[in-house]
Each structure stands twice: as structure tokens, then as C-alpha cells.
């Protein structure tokens, strides 16, 4: 080499040092600006020629451009792709980490290849710089693959190559993992491989251009080839098999509850066009219940309604006195006069008049309110209460016919009005029943409250001024005999004392004491004469 020519710098060693520093700065997230001093001839020379200028060194200009492109590619690719492959069996141990080569050794072994200096149309520029292809796919790297170690993120991985579909190929168990660990992964440009994985004409240049061909991508097992894709998918499948083994053995999924199958939803039946879009509730259709007949007229008309038979009926009915022994019936003529002589008799219709006559006859003469509160008037099986005695209803029908039959048009009209009157009578029974219950409950509650405060006979223990008198203790004297001749002075004194206590004005203020004493003496003399016999008379001697 002549004296005037610049000495060729040791580019490979300098590029190795630059890549080492770039990788270190990238890992530390530090990107210093490239200065002119860092890329000068002094940096790439051997240190002996310091008089050469930057403009005179054309090789330095090209190297500066290549280094700039290299740094840009490293900054884009290095944070996204791991430098080291996954550790075997996804278990990181100290021995496995120690067995991995150091970072600077990997860079020195992988960057000592010369990149082609010219690009021809037949030799396209690869997607990744040649100095990084072996580094990124080197099997000797020691950094663990975080994405592949996490078996829970296997399904979220993207396909290895954009030219291959995303799928899983099931390999033989145990073969794929061994092949993947022993294979040396290489990088090749996707443009040099067709869709079938075969090399194209562009990858095979002439013999004179062999020095410009990227020898790293040469071979049938490049990362974008079919064989390499199958191996990558086989490695992912091995992780998935391990994940399924853990799942089957319930190693980490033993706490996941089993979901019970959901019952299928019932589909509502289609509606016809007559519903106008209204949907019916699902379930069996309920047929409308037939109302129970409350007509008692049929039962009455089947009876013997002759005047001679009705005259034999006992009115009021016997059950009326059994239910209420204090019931006092009103005469028939008196009830008829109350209806006819009423102010609204001329204004009322004949049906309303019959209703009023039936109510008064039932409550005041035939049944009584106590029996009506326990029964009803309706057809068979219409109510839980039993019917009123049929003889009493026949008697009411007879009175209504005798008084109001002339105002009806025909026989059927009479029975229609009588049917409505019986329904009103049943309603009257319900009202009497409710009134009796309410009154009885109110009276019982009031009597219980008063008896707790003042005694059992408190309603009758009131004086004339309305003040409550304390309950008197029972006397120890025997009860007064009904016969006045057998009464004693002590009993008379007790009666006078009680009588004086019950009076508003004391008895001594009205009658003088001498009169009372004389009266008591008069009452006591006949008793003494009866008790003491007369003295015996001696018979006179005739002599």
C-alpha cells in the first residue's frame, strides 16, 4: 500500500465495538447523539494516520451511513425481539443460565460477516441487516424468551411469518422439541422465498456475483421456509401440550368451579293474526270456571206452596229460638203495615217493595238476626254457610204473593223479582254477620279492659253521679232468705247498710232514726211471737 493512499481501517473490529456499545445503550434505554468525532477517520483507522481529512476518506462516509442505518435498525428491532431463545422445559435454573454464552461472545461470532456492498436488481436488499440476523436467531443466546415461557399467552402469539397462515400443526410427541433445540435458526429475506417455500431465481445469482450474495440466508431451513415454520409451530405445540397436561392433572386449575349447563329457553308459541300483536303468557291455558248457580227459586218452586201447607209451618222457625232464645217476633200484619204505610211506598217500584218486605219478614218475624248471621240464601254448593230453613222462605214467598201479586204482569215476572229479592236477602245476611262480629269483638275488648282495671261487674258498679265505686268485698253473712218471716235482725241490718251505700242520699237524712227503730221492732215482733210459744194454761178444777 502506497504512502499517499489512506490506510484501510479495521472496519470489522470497529463495527463489532460499535454494535456492542449500541446494544448496551439500547438495553439501558440510552440513545446518545452520534457526533462527528465518533465517526471520524481516527475512530476507524489504526491511529497512525491522523492527517487525513473527512472529505478525502470516501470509505468513512459510506461506513458512517451504514452505521447510521445499522443503529436505526437495532433501535427498531432489538426492543421487540429477544436476543436469547427460551430455556429448555420452561424452567429457568442457575445451571442453565451459567451454561449460556456471554453477550459479547455472541456479538463477536455473529458480526464477523461482511455485508454486501452493492445491491443489484437481482439481489434485493434484505429486510433485516445481515449483522443482526444470526444474533436475533442464535440458539446460543442466553436471554429467556418471556413470551414463550408464559404458557398462558400461547394462543395470543402472532404467526411466525406473514406469508404463512396462523394455525397449529400437531407433530409427533417428543420429536418437535428435540429438533427445535438442536436446529440452528437462520434468517433469510422473504423476497427470496416464494409462497411454497422454494428458492426463486432472484436468490441464485451468477458466479461472478457470488461475493454479493447473502450467505446467511442460504439453505432450505431459513426462518421463513416451510420446514422452519413447521418447527416453530411444533415448539409452540409442545408448550400447549404441557399446558394441557397441567390442566388435565388439575395442577393449577383445581379451584375453577365447573359450570352447570344452562337450561334451554322455552320458545313462546307463535300467535295468530287475530291477537293484534299481543302475546299470551306461557303455560297451560286455564278454562274459565263456570259460576255456581245461586238461584234458590228452583228449590222453592219444587216445594208445596199451597195455602193449606204453608198454614202448617211454624213461624218463626224453630232454629230462630235455638240460635237466640231472646228473639221476639213481630206480627205479620204489623210488618205489612210498615211497608204499605211508608212514605216511599207509592214512589218505589214493585221489585224494590218486594225486597224491603222480604228483608223485614226475615229479620223481624221468620228467622231473626242471630240465625241470619249464621246462614245465607243461595243455591246448593254456592257458599260455605248453610241455607236458611226452606219453610221460612216459602212462607216469605206466600206473604209477598198475597200482598204484591196484583202489581205483576204474569207469573214469571213475579218469580224474577222474587229471585232478585232473595239475592238481596243473602247480602243482608252477610251484612248482619259482619255487624255481629264487629260488635261482638268491640264489646268483648271493652269488657275485658274494664274487668282488668276495676273488676268483673264494673259496668253495673256506677253510682248516680257517674263515679266509679270501688268493688265491695263480699259479706260473711249468709244469703238472705226469700221468706220475710225467716229473716233475722243481722240480715236486715246488712240489707239496710247496702241500700244506704247504693243510695245517692243517705237514708238517715230522709227518715228519722226513731222511725227506723220502730219499724225494725215491728218487723221483729211477729217473728218473736212465732218462735216463742204461748204459756200453758192450767185447767180449772170443777171443784
Curated annotation (Swiss-Prot):
Compartments reported by the entry: Nucleus
GO MF annotation terms: DNA binding
PTM statement from Swiss-Prot or TrEMBL: Cleaved by caspase ced-3 in vitro.
Listed Polar residues bias regions: 177-213
Keywords carried by this UniProt record: Developmental protein, DNA-binding, Nucleus, Transcription, Transcription regulation
Positions with biased composition (Low complexity): 268-282
Region ranges (Disordered): 165-228, 268-291
Cellular component, GO, one term: nucleus
Protein role: Heterochronic protein which controls the choice of stage specific cell fates. Involved in the temporal progression of vulval fate patterning, possibly by inhibiting lin-12. Acts as a transcription factor involved in the stage-specific repression of insulin/insulin-like growth factor gene ins-33.
Protein name according to UniProt: Protein lin-14
Protein species of origin: Caenorhabditis briggsae
Organism placement in taxonomy: Eukaryota, Metazoa, Ecdysozoa, Nematoda, Chromadorea
Encoding gene (name): lin-14
